[in-house]
């Protein structure tokens, strides 16, 4: 049964400040958290009850140990994670403003995950792959870019759903043009595209989403997140909306990852195949969007990314607190 969520990409340590409203140079202390968008998504899906597996490489160092221990505690399959003594685990330092919005400084050139190669990716890893998710951070010119291409090929051979979140981090690219061109190169592989309003503007120069399928014609479902303005789900038949939930956000790190993970989890929970994606009803898609929107909101009420991802029980409590109903359409 192809019921595994597989993610490929960066694995790093987020150093989150213990105070808000200070510039990075003025922060006195940090707390370390397991991070990287693919890692966040695998952990969140596992916390909700899905099977998830990570394809990446970490250093043979204390930070790599911490990432693997954290993922194991979340019940994420780490059998496809490689270790290397040649390159260190990547690091990111985060500054938070008074509203929990982030500013990143990265230390990842060179780093372990960028040196996972296509030769490290094998067909046996994909035998039970139902969904493959990836982002753009590790699509810079490196061995890992070609590992992505092989992973996508192997996932497609399993008829898996391909999910892509551009997750734009411009400081990691040689130029804005290189970032944009690479994202547009990989977007056609995706059945599901999760994108923020800022990323849509960066890629298209437009904030008008009504013609989004002219830019991404191969996508079956597009998920557009707009922060406090809520979120949208678009297919070629339906345009759906959910308003934001009035939480007190303290850290938005990983909120988009929480949204994506919640959506992908529901597809796995309900055994939705790639062939079924275009035929999902408006009502079911609205439920999926409401669930994802709420799960992302909940994640902003805690510090860190993996740590902030709710378990099913924790999410039930959040839904009750905000009187959100009609979310679950089947038991986990």
Predicted regions: what they are:
Residues 1-77, 328-332:
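Glycine-rich phosphate/adenosyl-contacting loop at the front of the ribokinase-like
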Residues 1-6, 153, 208-332:
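Conserved phosphate-binding/catalytic region of the ribokinase-like
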Residues 6-8, 131-133, 163, 194, ...:
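Structural motif
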Residues 51-134, 317-332:
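Conserved N-terminal subdomain of the carbohydrate kinase-like
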Residues 90, 136-140, 296, 302-305:
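Glycine-rich phosphate/pyrophosphate-binding beta-alpha loops
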Residues 124-125, 185-186, 215:
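Structural alpha-helical scaffold elements that stabilize or flank donor/cofactor-binding regions
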Residues 127-128, 188-189, 218:
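Alpha-helix C-terminal capping/helix-to-coil transition sites in glycosyltransferase folds
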Residues 137-211, 229-230:
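Conserved beta-alpha-beta core of the PfkB/ribokinase-like small-molecule kinase fold
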């Amino acid at each position: 049964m192809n019921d595994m969520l597989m993610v490929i990409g960066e694995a790093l340590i987020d150093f989150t400040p213990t105070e808000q409203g200070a510039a990075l140079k003025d922060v006195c202390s940090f707390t370390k958290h397991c991070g990287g968008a693919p890692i966040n998504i695998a952990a969140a899906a596992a916390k909700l009850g899905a099977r998830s597996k990570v394809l990446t490489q970490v250093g043979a160092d204390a930070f790599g140990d911490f990432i693997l221990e954290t993922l194991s505690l979340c019940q994420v399959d780490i059998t496809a994670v490689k270790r290397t003594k040649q390159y260190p685990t990547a690091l990111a330092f985060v500054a938070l403003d008074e509203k929990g919005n982030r500013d990143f400084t990265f230390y990842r050139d060179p780093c372990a995950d960028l040196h996972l190669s296509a030769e490290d990716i094998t067909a046996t890893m994909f035998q039970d792959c139902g969904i493959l998710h990836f982002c753009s951070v590790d699509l810079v010119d490196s061995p890992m870019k070609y590992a992505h291409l092989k992973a996508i090929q192997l996932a497609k051979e399993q008829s898996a759903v391909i999910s892509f979140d551009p997750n734009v981090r411009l400081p990691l690219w040689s130029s804005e043009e290189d970032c944009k061109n690479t994202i547009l190169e990989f977007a056609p592989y995706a059945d599901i595209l999760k994108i923020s309003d800022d990323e849509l503007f960066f890629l298209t120069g437009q904030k008008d989403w009504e013609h989004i399928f002219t830019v991404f014609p191969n996508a079956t479902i597009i998920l557009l997140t707009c922060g406090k303005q809520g979120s949208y789900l678009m297919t070629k038949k339906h345009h759906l909306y959910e308003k934001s939930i009035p939480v007190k956000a303290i850290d938005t790190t990983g909120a988009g990852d929480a949204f994506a993970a919640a959506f992908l989890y529901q597809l796995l929970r309900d055994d939705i195949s790639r062939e079924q994606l275009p035929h999902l009803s408006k009502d079911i898609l609205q439920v999926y969007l409401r669930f994802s929107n709420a799960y992302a909101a909940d994640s902003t009420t805690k510090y860190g990314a993996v740590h902030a991802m709710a378990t099913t029980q924790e999410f039930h409590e959040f839904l009750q607190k905000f009187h959100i109903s009609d979310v679950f359409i089947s038991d986990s």
